[in-house]
């Protein structure tokens, strides 16, 4: 095997347990997911083109460092088209909301920061109509309606111990904890001032993207 060859350059991957992954099929399905997301919400179209997709087994599911989206071929090959669209939108939203940069600035513990950031992202996607709780639950994502209209800081402060034992945790806590490819974030909150701050932050992110100032 050519060790310099990228995973996506293989027609078929054979895992140690004998599992075969059709990479041509996977890449085609990923392209369909990108097109579907851009159709559902055109705002994402330009953002999809700005990130590089890296297929790797160093993450358990998918993750982003703000510039790349790291894709585990085995995990992703098992997803339906709807699930692929959700996971793709989820990773891009971490970039839009600058979770990695903001989490580092606040110096919060990584796992707890990831959990708060994931709750914020998934709540936003549900409210935008890109996904729903059933799709998120099927991928093990973290979602709780009580965090709707709340941002990273308040979610973190409200739930500092992380999700309860009843919450879904196959999650992004695992997927963002490998190799520093994590994202933590900022935003608003449940009271009036937090909500105003959150909406202002989201509006500013969109404006920055339109003006070419948003770097992902």
What feature does the model see in each segment?
Residues 1-84, 88, 92-131:
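Basic/hydrophobic alpha-helical interface regions
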Residues 123-216:
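Negatively charged
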């Amino acid at each position: 095997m050519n060790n310099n060859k990228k995973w996506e350059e293989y027609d078929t991957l054979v895992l140690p347990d004998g599992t075969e992954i059709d990479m041509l099929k996977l890449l085609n399905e990923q392209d369909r997911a990108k097109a579907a997301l851009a159709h559902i919400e055109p705002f994402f179209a330009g953002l999809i083109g700005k990130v590089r997709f890296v297929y790797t087994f160093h993450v358990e599911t998918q993750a982003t460092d703000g510039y790349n989206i790291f894709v585990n071929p085995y995990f992703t090959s098992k997803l339906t088209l709807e699930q692929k669209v959700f996971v793709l939108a989820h990773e891009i939203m971490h970039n839009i909301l600058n979770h990695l940069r903001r989490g580092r600035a606040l110096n919060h513990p990584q796992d707890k920061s990831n959990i708060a950031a994931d709750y914020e992202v998934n709540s936003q996607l549900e409210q935008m109509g890109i996904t729903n709780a059933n799709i998120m639950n099927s991928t093990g994502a973290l979602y709780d309606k009580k965090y709707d209209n709340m941002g990273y800081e308040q979610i973190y402060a409200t739930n500092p111990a992380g999700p309860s034992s009843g919450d879904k945790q196959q999650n992004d806590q695992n997927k963002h904890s490998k190799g520093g490819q994590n994202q933590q974030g900022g935003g608003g909150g449940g009271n009036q001032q937090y909500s105003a701050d959150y909406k202002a932050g989201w509006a500013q992110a969109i404006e920055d993207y339109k003006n070419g100032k948003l770097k992902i």
